[in-house]
Amino acid sequence: MGETVMKMLAINPISLKKRMTEFLFDYLFILAYLVLLFLGSMLIYIIFFNGVPEFTEIQSQWLVFLTSILPITLLFTFLDYKNDGSFGKVKAGLELVYQKKTVQASLIRNTIKFLPWQIGHIGTIHGFYSEFDVLSISLSISATLLAVLLLAMTMFRNDKRHLGDLLAHTQVQLKGD
């Protein structure tokens, strides 16, 4: 099956309102997942462990990665690849276009997109175990700066592409453009 090569727009007409709509719906979806994850985890902890068990820092890092970051990254990778966009993109009338549509491109894009979240978790979890030493604070600041950079790129670049889009050769466009 031959893949269609899509054109990247040098001047992308997506409005800030459409991007904020996309971000809001994706945020609400992720928040709902995290609330269900919390409730399910607490239920399991209460039923099987008589309360929340003690975890080492490494166990906490893996638990957070495997239950929140990895599933969300893989789900958004799937949605971007299969449906040309996340729930937020669909709701906002946007779609993800690829220079060459591959699962790898979608995974690269979403890994970069959720990297600030993962770095933030690493810093915060390390902070709980280290009384917020220089490393944990540095990681938390780095996560925030990277998130701001990615958001600023989607808002202020003429092509509206963030670092993940540049590396994956993708672009969010108005649906049907």
Predicted regions and their residues:
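Membrane-interfacial and juxtamembrane segments of integral membrane proteins
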Residues: 1-177
